[in-house]
Amino acid sequence: MTESNRLRIAIQKSGRLSTDSQQLLKSCGVKFSINEQRLIAHADNMPIDLLRVRDDDIPGLVMDGVVDLGIIGENVLEEEQIERQTLNKPAEYVKLRQLDFGACRLSLAVPTEFSYADASSLEGLRIATSYPNLLRRFMQQKSINYRDCMLKGSVEVAPRAGLADGICDLVSTGATLEANGLYETEVIYRSMACIIQSTQTQAPSKQALIDRILSRVNGVIRARESKYILLHAPTETLDQIVALLPGAENPTVLPLNDDTNRVAIHAVSTEDLFWDTMEQLTALGASSILVMPIEKMMG
């Protein structure tokens, strides 16, 4: 490929999505090494360039067609799209798929001594946030007037510092809120990481590479969500045992040497096989039960 046909993928330089994004691409067979002093990493085995940038720059780079793909949190993506629509700037993109990491929620939170009934309890109050557009949309939908306090970081300290009456911030476990004397009151947006593509027309060779990468991403995520199950089962309870395997599709049943009363079952399960299920399998006569992770899947 020529330089212009190299696939450019924007990922977060550092932060919660950086490691997961790199691991996903490596699991898809993209070989690269990261030099912390450089913003661009060139793949060794594919015509792919990784641009390591701030997460809030990724949506704009994709929407402006500077890069072809971006891995970004849906919260950042939605925030930037609303901002660009307000400013009449390009705001189009194609979401290729949601990923299986980066889960978080954008929530309202108030001091523990605050009496909160519903979102209308915040009428006329000042709310600190790093996501003013998502907050504004939510409050407008609820017809609630409020004052905003825009902060780029450390939003959770705003009430104690006297800067705001409450906050709207990302929450994972709630431990940070509790440490700052706050409690979560309402979720206004749930987010996962996703892959987005520019709406610009791609050269056939580049689009073929995008499709190839997406196919591998689908396979990696499907493998992560699946388990390979092997067990021995008596033929008299075979149907009951197969019915117990969660999410199993067309398990393979093989005869055992020198044992006409038992068979081997191989199955791919798309759900977790919990201990109670394994105990039920054992009660039906299953033995040698193995549950193994799957590295890759295709087809």
Swiss-Prot record:
**GO molecular function annotation:** ATP binding; ATP phosphoribosyltransferase activity; magnesium ion binding
Q: What class of enzyme is it?
A: transferase
Is Glycosyltransferase given among the entry's keywords?
Answer: yes
Provide the E.C. number(s) assigned to this enzyme: 2.4.2.17
Chief localization: cytoplasm
User: What pathway is this protein a component of?
Assistant: Amino-acid biosynthesis; L-histidine biosynthesis; L-histidine from 5-phospho-alpha-D-ribose 1-diphosphate: step 1/9
Q: Any idea where this protein resides?
A: Cytoplasm
- Entry keyword rRNA-binding: no
Q: Name one GO biological process term.
A: L-histidine biosynthetic process
Question: Which keywords describe this protein according to UniProt?
Answer: Amino-acid biosynthesis, ATP-binding, Cytoplasm, Glycosyltransferase, Histidine biosynthesis, Magnesium, Metal-binding, Nucleotide-binding, Transferase
Q: Which CDD domains match?
A: PBP2_HisGL2 (cd13592)
Q: Name one GO cellular component term.
A: cytoplasm
Q: Any inhibitors or activators noted?
A: Feedback inhibited by histidine.
Q: Which reaction does it catalyse?
A: 1-(5-phospho-beta-D-ribosyl)-ATP + diphosphate = 5-phospho-alpha-D-ribose 1-diphosphate + ATP
One Pfam family it belongs to: HisG_C
Cofactor names from the entry are:
Mg(2+)
Q: Which domain of life is it from?
A: Bacteria
Q: Which PANTHER family match?
A: ATP PHOSPHORIBOSYLTRANSFERASE (PTHR21403:SF8), ATP PHOSPHORIBOSYLTRANSFERASE ATP-PRTASE (PTHR21403)
As for what it does, the entry says: Catalyzes the condensation of ATP and 5-phosphoribose 1-diphosphate to form N'-(5'-phosphoribosyl)-ATP (PR-ATP). Has a crucial role in the pathway because the rate of histidine biosynthesis seems to be controlled primarily by regulation of HisG enzymatic activity.
Protein family (similarity comment): Belongs to the ATP phosphoribosyltransferase family. Long subfamily.
Instruction: From the Swiss-Prot or TrEMBL record, give the protein name.
Output: ATP phosphoribosyltransferase
